[in-house]
Amino acid sequence: MMDISPTCYGYIDDEQDLALVFQGVFNGNLRCIERRPYDAEKVELVNPGNIFVFNEEKSGIKRWTDGFSWSPSRISGKFLVYREYNRLGSTHDLPLHNVPEYNIFERAHRKYFYTGLLKKTFSLKFNMDPTDSTKLETFHLIAYYTEKDIHQGSLRRPSENPFFHKFRPSQKLLDALQKVAVGNGRSNPSKNNERGRTKAHNYKTRRSLSSSPSYCDLLSNYNNHPGNIPVRTAVQLPLTTFNNAPREMHQQQHRQQQQYLLPIDEQNKLPLPYMQHQPQPIGVYNPNYQPGLRRTVSQPMIFCNTYNTLPQQPTAAPYERRGVSPSVIYSSNTLSPIPYQNIDPYSSRSGPECNHSKAPIAPTMMPPVHHILVHDYRQPKPVTDSINPPNVNITTSTTNKNLDGIYILPAPRMNPPAQTQYQMIHAPDSMQHPPTFSKNNTSSNPKSHQYSK
């Protein structure tokens, strides 16, 4: 048999019901809960109509736990109301699930079933010691009920129960119930007054903002001209309301902003990207051409001090047909040497698969006056005997002409000398089989240790 039981049975609706129940507890006619119920007792104790009252200091219960799943609290007057939600739906038939039970994601997203059970709580701090008025004790009330019981009237309130008619709540208890804040059991009237003063201050602030001159002017303009829609941006306010800086500073900022609106001069225009310009010949300076990229120190530029006005087309030197780049280019008037850099990777290649790019010559430049002697490797090589190569000192005096009429002297070829054949000398048999030494063969003559011939 359980030694724990509900304090009373019924339904708590308002403060009058609270006063009757607490007065019965203070008089000793109703019994408080002295300990926390066990897990086996919770199922039988949590039933609609049961009302529990316990003293926090004497029972040691800081928080009431009954093992049920409840929703977040809702404020109802001075009470906190909770709804029971059963995750597995014990009051309904469970549907079949193909998902295993260990699937946490599926279990976390299951629907909660409202069972209809409600829990209403209330807390009160009351002085039970007449000798010490500062000593307060905390009393908690827990009541269970269902909506069906309320609509059907199966649960009676303490004010409707004849058993509670003999209890007369004291004025001290009624004052303590009046001081309880809404939604909790903490009585702090000073904080409530402070909250009220804060609300009044905020209301006065909003009233003062609405009565500002700019807002009143806007409303008066709207009343005089009903067709216009009141817009706050149309109000003209002095410049000092936005910024306290002097007027000269604003004028200077205005002038700086106007400079960005001026048209750009032709000489101050920035160059366009490089891909928007047509490519120019490499190594030739054109004064009318404006490249998209700026020339740096590492990028050489070929130019002449004087220019020839004759409309002369560029001509290619004879060596250009063979893909040989000139080493020096001379100007037409000053004959000053200008270094030439050929960047074309295919200029030194030959063959039908390579498109020859001729060395660019400016129209103001003359062809080179000096030809470069280049060995023509297209001439047939002299046939030599691989077994007996010719001597190195022998030089051929034959000269050949290339297609341009230039005499070409073949370069001397370094031929390796003939290998010298050496005769193999075999060692005598005595070297192959050295004599053996023994103890009897020892002597002081050093010649005796020599090999026998």
From Swiss-Prot:
Biased composition range(s): Basic residues: 198-207
GO terms, biological process: positive regulation of transcription by RNA polymerase II
Record-level GO cellular component terms: nucleus
Biased composition (Polar residues): 433-453
One Pfam family, short name: Gti1_Pac2
InterPro entries assigned to the protein according to its UniProt record, in alphabetical order: Gti1/Pac2 (IPR018608)
Stretch list, region Disordered: 183-210, 428-453
Organism superkingdom: Eukaryota
A GO term, aspect molecular function: DNA binding
PANTHER family the UniProt entry points to: TRANSCRIPTIONAL REGULATOR MIT1
Protein's UniProt name: Uncharacterized protein YHR177W
Organism per entry: Saccharomyces cerevisiae (strain ATCC 204508 / S288c) (Baker's yeast)
Origin organism lineage: Eukaryota, Fungi, Dikarya, Ascomycota, Saccharomycotina
